[in-house]
Amino acid sequence: MKKSLLFALCSLVLSACAKNEWQLVWSDEFDADTLNTAYWNTEDNARGGGNAELQYYTPKNITMEVHPVTGEHCLVLNAQREDYKNRPCTSARLNTHDKVTVEYGKVEARIAFPYTADGLWPAFWMLGNNLAKNLGNDDSIDQQAAQLANEGRVVWPKCGEIDICEMGHHFGIENGIQDRYFNGACHWGESFNNGAYPNIGMFRTEDYPVQGDFHLFTLIWSEDSIAMYLDQDKYPEVKPYFQLSLRGKQINEPGHYFNHPFYLVLNLSVGGFFPNMPAAEKYPEIITADDPSFQRVTALPADGTPVKMYVDFIRVYKKRG
């Protein structure tokens, strides 16, 4: 009994010390009735990041709502079936490009991801702030690299990408573990090069569902490493689900690309390569409800009821001292 009590007290002390390491430098608690556009850019396009996604991203699918169970005021990304600008469904994506950036420190987000079922691909991630605007993951833009360099901008993946959490991968669908299967990832390199760029993704099957309810996703990023954690608030000693050394600083080594400011991205995709439900073309002009991949999407109710991704807060910390 005494040993158990001593262990519990030590755990509390360690947790308190860990919290005191960090100083909050920015947050969005999403308590207002409208989105703070001093922080956030909303996207209005059907590009889908070069991933053959099926949705149209529109600002109307971004709302501020009270969570029906917990009562927290949240940012909400909505995905739904509807014919809209040559797409069979709509959803939301927003970012802090050139408004809020992070370079090293800790990033936390408390998110209730929707049940992805078959077809949803939600994510919380980051891109290098030096990425040229309105280009995204387009392998056709490498030819513009020289011009962009003169403007201080680069193309993907030279900017670097940090995926703090993604859900909806086809392995989870194929094995019936969609609600417990997720990943962290990093992408980098000098050019897209037909997909032959350096990257690493680490997938995890959790013991409990990570969809439907709120969970805390944490990135800890230093000059030497990147690490990602699930539910560190509940389990302070939890091991990271993703780790990457940044000690290698040469071209095509990760440390060469994750040493500058990054911006935040939230999105709720429908279809695409990740869940193995891509459109027939990478950048199609028209996708209809008869598209074979869209026919396989089970996550969106037939009556057009939105599926919701709730974000309670995002917080950025720097180490004290």
Question: Where do the model's predicted regions map?
Answer:
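GH16 jelly-roll
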Residues: 18-321
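Bacterial Sec-dependent N-terminal signal peptides
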Residues: 1-21
